[in-house]
Each structure stands twice: as structure tokens, then as C-alpha cells.
Swiss-Prot record:
Induction: Up-regulated by dietary cholesterol and cholestyramine. Down-regulated by dietary bile acids, such as chenodeoxycholic acid and cholic acid. GO terms for cellular component: endoplasmic reticulum membrane; intracellular membrane-bounded organelle. It holds the Pfam family p450. It comes from the Eukaryota. This is Cytochrome P450 7A1. SUPFAM superfamilies: Cytochrome P450. Belongs to the cytochrome P450 family. Keywords: Cholesterol metabolism, Endoplasmic reticulum, Heme, Iron, Lipid metabolism, Membrane, Metal-binding, Microsome, Monooxygenase, Oxidoreductase, Steroid metabolism, Sterol metabolism, Transmembrane, Transmembrane helix. Pathway: Lipid metabolism; bile acid biosynthesis; Steroid metabolism; cholesterol degradation. GO terms for biological process: bile acid biosynthetic process; cellular response to cholesterol; cellular response to glucose stimulus; cholesterol catabolic process; cholesterol homeostasis; negative regulation of collagen biosynthetic process; negative regulation of fatty acid biosynthetic process; positive regulation of cholesterol biosynthetic process.
Length: 503
């Protein structure tokens, strides 16, 4: 027994030595400082995952503004100087921004690659998104969202006894329920043959979405979904409802989904379930960050009396100018694109809420060896290495945003009450100062719609409801760090609030 243990011990020791000699990457001349970590393959992943912000700050103090970390077998160059962000974007010809995102999508949602280079489809999906989420298409999408929000918030035929009563609910649960149902109907339409059971079906989809989304960080990290039986079953149920045979019988399906259905049928070799899973990816992208962003915007607005007053006055003025009535009854409220865009206070509230809660990781993959020229110097980058920006470092930098952990509803307003677009770091004007939606070629194509639907939600909450926290001195809930890198962080726990319809 002792001999066997000794042999195993020697084998492990030899393996570790071989890994140390062969497996550890060595820093070459001109490359950024390197952190390999102590654990094979994982490298620094556990430290990074436990608290990305503090991990990056610690390495920034140790190495300066540019350094390399091994994460899950990949070498990631972190650029932490906000003055260099725009310089990274200028090197676009050396980056493959699609590779990481397409691989992640296939891994999480269970379809084959949507990269045209892999031969499964010839669709340029980024062009599809741009065509159907911006410009004229945004008008019809926003109009549908406003109608669906009002249908969900103010269901027709509500008994007067219920409309007069205060309702107590978790604010995050409320935002989740309202935004999911309205967003689902806006993108995928409604089944007119199942009007009576429509709400129950969507709420069932909501439960499945929560189950799937709960394990999403693990899927992105590389764990197979088969390890999570409940989430796997939930994903398959969601996809089943998004098969083309089911979407074809729905009314008011968005232009985005109708175009994607056509392109999937004509340009891809995907089977029916894979096509449905590409639609599931759109559902996730439309909900996973918008829901927590909506919560933080509402929470921070109600928590700040100054923000509440300024927003209420702005919304009231906009509705009156548009000839709309500020009440819960009567005709539906509607503001067009020009009117929605002319709400600087709501814009600033949303931006400030997202600044405090966003923790996205902007990633690009090097297509070849090249030299990256930044404000801090030039660095040699190897092919297949990743370049990463972590904008939370900038969003919480006191040099750029004084008192960065405090919500200031007018932080993005200038002295004249218009949108503020000038921010500085070390006396230098920043070209990039607000990045919750990504940057450059990887910027979220649906960002304009996301902001508009949050704005519409806030308009309806202010115009239709009386709003109060259950606790008068409510504290800000901590952020759920388990989703760091994916976008907007949800609250670690919910906050109780109460609401009732205005009369």
C-alpha cells in the first residue's frame, strides 16, 4: 500500500513538474505582464470569478494599466485605462469579435454555430439585428411594446375594488413579470386561438426562463447543460414554443422574428429545434439584462425624492404636450420616437442606474499576431489571445465620476438640463465614458430599444400608479456578483414595494 501511494505521489509530482515546464506560458519581450495562476487550465479564473472588480484593481496596482491573465485556458489581456478604450477600438482589423460570441451562443442555447464561416448558415445576423432593431423598424417595435406594457399593467375589465387597493410585491419580481410578458408578446406576438390561456402560457415560459437563466453563467463558463437537468428541461420547453410551426399561428410577430424565420428557412441547414434555439437566444438577449436594468431604474428613481420629482414633472409635461391624459383610465398613453427621445431626465436616471449596476466584459479575439498601440505604450499580442475591457472599472472611477457609489439622477445632465457628454480622466477628455451596452463592433444592436422600453415602463409607472416602498428607509440591495461579466447585475435580494392605480 505504501509503495502504491509513493508511486502515485511521484506520478503527480512529475505531472506537475511537466505542466510547470511545458504548460506555463512565458512572457516574451514587448508583451504585457503575465499572471498564469496556480491551477492548471483554470489559471486565475476562480479569483476573477469571485470578485472581478477587486481582482482587476489589485492587478492594476501590481502591474499597471495593461496585464494578461490566464482564464479557463485562454489568455486575456485586460486594458484598464479608460483613456485607452478608444485606442483598442481603432485596431478592429486585427480582431475577430464574432468568434467568442458565436461560440458562447452555441454552447449556451444548444444550436450549431451561426458563424457563416462554419457553413451552417449564410445569414449575417448582425445585419439582421441592425435592420430590425434600429431606424424605422424601432418605431413599430416601440409602439407594440407600449401597447403590451399597458395591457399587462392595466388589464381591461379590472374590478374597481381591486383598482383601488394597494398591492404589495417584490419590486424585482414585479419588473420581471411585467417586462417578460410585455417583451415576449412584442417579439413573438400572441396566439389568437388561445386568448383565454395566453397569460398562463407566458407565465409558464417565465418560470422556464428563470430556471434556464439561473445556470447561464455556468454555461458560459463551459459547463455542459446536461449537468443541470431542470435547466436543460426548461430550455427545451422554451425552444419548443418557439418552433416555426408554433410561431406561424401567432399574430403580431415582430419584424425581427419574421425576418429571422425566413432567413433560417432559406439560408440555413438548421433543423426545426435548432432554428427555435436561435430564437431562444434572441429571447434571452432581450430579457436577461433589460429586466434588472428596469428594476434598478425604478428602484433608484423611487428612492431619490429629487429624481422622483424631476421625472414626474418631465413625464407630466411630455404627456400634456402630446395631448395625453395623465391617469389610469381612458385611452392608452402613447409617445412617438421624437417625444421619447426628448426626455433627458429619464435618460439620465436610466444611465445612472446602469452605471451603478453594469458589469459587462467586452471581449475580442486576436486574428493574428500584432502590436496594440495604447496611451500607456505598445504591447505585442499573440494570435487567438483575447483583449478585454471591463467598463465597471471606469464607471466606478472617482476621477471620472465623483462619489461614484452614490446615485445622482442628474449626473448625465449639463447645466442647461440637456444630455451631458463631456467627462474627464486626469484632465483628459474621454471618448468612451459610458459602456453598459458594449463598444465598437460588439455594441448591443438592441440598445436603443432596451432604453426605450425601460423609459416606457417608467412613464407608465409614474403616470398610472402611486408608488411607495414598504420600508421608509430602504437600503440599496447588493449586486449579485455571480453574473459579473454578463451585463447588468440583478439585486442579491428583492425589495418590497406597494402600488395602486391613480384615479
Amino acid at each position: 500500500m505504501m509503495t502504491i501511494s509513493l508511486i502515485w505521489g511521484i506520478a503527480v509530482l512529475v505531472s506537475c513538474c511537466i505542466w510547470f515546464i511545458v504548460g506555463i506560458r512565458r512572457r516574451k519581450a514587448g508583451e504585457p505582464p503575465l499572471e498564469n495562476g496556480l491551477i492548471p487550465y483554470l489559471g486565475c479564473a476562480l479569483k476573477f470569478g469571485s470578485n472581478p472588480l477587486e481582482f482587476l484593481r489589485a492587478n492594476q496596482r501590481k502591474h499597471g494599466h495593461v496585464f494578461t491573465c490566464k482564464l479557463m485556458g485562454k489568455y486575456v489581456h485586460f486594458i484598464t485605462n479608460s483613456l485607452s478604450y478608444h485606442k483598442v477600438l481603432c485596431h478592429g482589423k486585427y480582431f475577430d469579435w464574432k468568434k467568442f460570441h458565436y461560440t458562447t451562443s452555441a454552447k449556451a442555447f444548444g444550436h450549431r454555430s451561426i458563424d457563416p464561416n462554419d457553413g451552417n448558415t449564410t445569414e449575417n445576423i448582425n445585419n439582421t439585428f441592425t435592420k430590425t432593431l434600429q431606424g424605422d423598424a424601432l418605431c413599430s417595435l416601440s409602439e407594440a411594446m407600449m401597447q403590451n406594457l399597458q395591457s399587462v399593467m392595466r388589464p381591461p375589465g379590472l374590478p374597481k375594488s381591486k383598482s383601488n387597493a394597494w398591492v404589495t410585491e417584490g419590486m424585482y419580481a414585479f419588473c420581471y413579470r411585467v417586462m417578460f410578458e410585455a417583451g415576449y408578446l412584442t417579439l413573438f406576438g400572441r396566439d389568437i386561438s388561445k386568448t383565454d390561456t395566453q397569460k398562463a402560457l407566458i407565465l409558464n415560459n417565465l418560470d422556464n426562463f428563470k430556471q434556464f437563466d439561473q445556470v447561464f453563467p455556468a454555461l458560459v463558463a463551459g459547463l455542459p447543460i446536461h449537468l443541470f437537468k431542470t435547466a436543460h428541461k426548461a430550455r427545451e420547453k422554451l425552444a419548443e414554443g418557439l418552433k416555426h410551426k408554433n410561431l406561424c399561428v401567432r399574430d403580431q410577430v415582430s419584424e425581427l422574428i419574421r425576418l429571422r424565420m425566413f432567413l433560417n428557412d432559406t439560408l440555413s441547414t438548421f433543423d426545426d429545434m435548432e432554428k427555435a434555439k436561435t430564437h431562444l437566444a434572441i429571447l434571452w438577449a432581450s430579457q436577461a439584462n433589460t429586466i434588472p436594468a428596469t428594476f434598478w431604474s425604478l428602484f433608484q428613481m423611487i428612492r431619490s425624492p429629487e429624481a422622483m420629482k424631476a421625472a414626474s414633472e418631465e413625464v407630466s409635461g411630455a404627456l400634456q404636450s402630446a395631448g395625453q391624459e395623465l391617469s389610469s383610465g381612458g385611452s392608452a398613453i402613447y409617445l412617438d420616437q421624437v417625444q421619447l427621445n426628448d426626455l433627458p431626465v429619464l435618460d439620465s436616471i436610466i444611465k445612472e442606474a446602469l452605471r451603478l449596476s453594469s458589469a459587462s466584459l467586452n471581449i475580442r479575439t486576436a486574428k493574428e499576431d500584432f502590436t496594440l498601440h495604447l496611451e500607456d505604450g505598445s504591447y505585442n499580442i499573440r494570435k487567438d489571445d483575447m483583449i478585454a475591457l471591463y467598463p465597471q472599472l471606469m464607471h466606478l472611477d472617482p476621477e471620472i465620476y465623483p462619489d461614484p457609489l452614490t446615485f445622482k439622477y442628474d449626473r448625465y445632465l449639463d447645466e442647461s438640463g440637456k444630455a451631458k457628454t463631456t467627462f474627464y480622466s486626469n484632465g483628459n477628455k474621454l471618448k468612451c465614458f459610458y459602456m453598459p451596452f458594449g463598444s465598437g463592433a460588439t455594441i448591443c444592436p438592441g440598445r436603443l430599444f432596451a432604453v426605450q422600453e425601460i423609459k416606457q415602463f417608467l412613464i407608465l409607472m409614474l403616470s398610472c400608479f402611486e408608488l411607495e416602498f414598504v420600508e421608509s428607509q430602504v437600503k440599496c440591495p447588493p449586486l449579485d456578483q455571480s453574473r459579473a461579466g454578463l451585463g447588468i447585475l440583478p439585486p442579491l435580494h428583492d425589495i418590497e414595494f406597494k402600488y395602486k392605480l391613480k384615479h
